[in-house]
Regions:
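Compositionally biased terminal segments of proteins
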Residues: 1-266
């Protein structure tokens, strides 16, 4: 579901303040697709340092107020700030947060949003979020990612490189343990079209089955990586395939890195 006009207007104004240390992240990065299941109900701006967070929040607030928006600060902490931004009867939340600089790819320039977290970093973060808090929005987002970006199994495998406290199996089990939602919860989300939670559950259980089968096939010593093809695109690895050894094992690093020719192969 594409971003709403109100959110787009805010993001357009804030794009001038974005840079590699202050960038758009969260679900906004992939929910702006026309085929996404829902519309994001807040705007997340991530930062690698506390200093950049504090500076960006002040700069963004000034830009919005200069353009006729009203800001109500509802949470102001050293590592996190949240404001409700409103104008002409419409409102949304903007959140400025500190986040680890450890990621798979560098923050990338974006014609609409200024600078954004790489979608695959956003996707692995989303899987970790689902296992950590189990929100319905995370559940639906992970289903969308599984069907359109990269499989649950491949994302969970890579996500463990960002949190050594998880194994891929444990990560998926925690997500599965929390994935129980009453139909009434759908009313809290801005959906592109009506969703059937029974059908979603079937898709989820199939994704979990496929993920566990994949974990049993992959070399344990490679946990925490994305598998990239010759075009540097993330793929679902197939260990039984003759092409598996040719896939690049791409690991996370501080501020991320683009794959290089010298990156090790299997």
């Amino acid at each position: 579901m594409p971003l709403g006009a109100f959110e787009k207007s805010i993001l357009r104004l804030l794009s001038v303040n974005r840079n590699p240390e202050s960038y758009i992240a969260g679900a906004t990065v992939f929910l702006r697709r026309e085929d996404s299941l829902r519309q994001s109900q807040d705007i997340d701006v991530f930062h690698d340092t506390v200093k950049s967070l504090q500076s960006a929040a002040l700069l963004d607030a000034a830009v919005l107020e200069q353009n006729g928006y009203v800001l109500e600060w509802v949470d102001q902490q050293e590592l996190f700030r949240r404001a409700v931004v409103s104008r002409a009867g419409q409102a949304t939340k903007v959140e400025w947060a500190y986040d680890s600089a450890f990621r798979f790819f560098p923050v990338q320039a974006d014609a609409e949003l200024g600078f954004v977290l790489h979608p695959l970093d956003g996707a692995t973060n989303k899987v970790l979020a689902l296992a950590g808090r189990g929100e319905l929005r995370d559940y639906l987002d992970v289903l969308f990612l599984h069907q359109n970006i990269l499989s649950l199994g491949a994302l969970a495998w890579a996500a463990c490189g960002k949190d050594a406290g998880f194994t891929p199996q444990f990560l998926v089990e925690e997500a599965q343990r929390l994935a129980h939602y009453p139909a009434s919860r759908l009313n809290t989300l801005l959906l592109r079209e009506p969703l059937d939670l029974v059908q979603c559950k079937r898709q989820w259980l199939q994704a979990v089955t496929e993920a566990k089968a994949l974990f049993n096939q992959l070399p344990p010593e490679e946990v925490g990586c994305l598998y990239l093809d010759a075009n540097h695109q993330a793929v679902i690895p197939s260990p039984a395939s003759s092409e598996f050894s040719q896939l690049r094992r791409h690991h996370g690093s501080v501020r991320g890195a683009w794959p290089s020719i010298s990156e090790s192969l299997g």
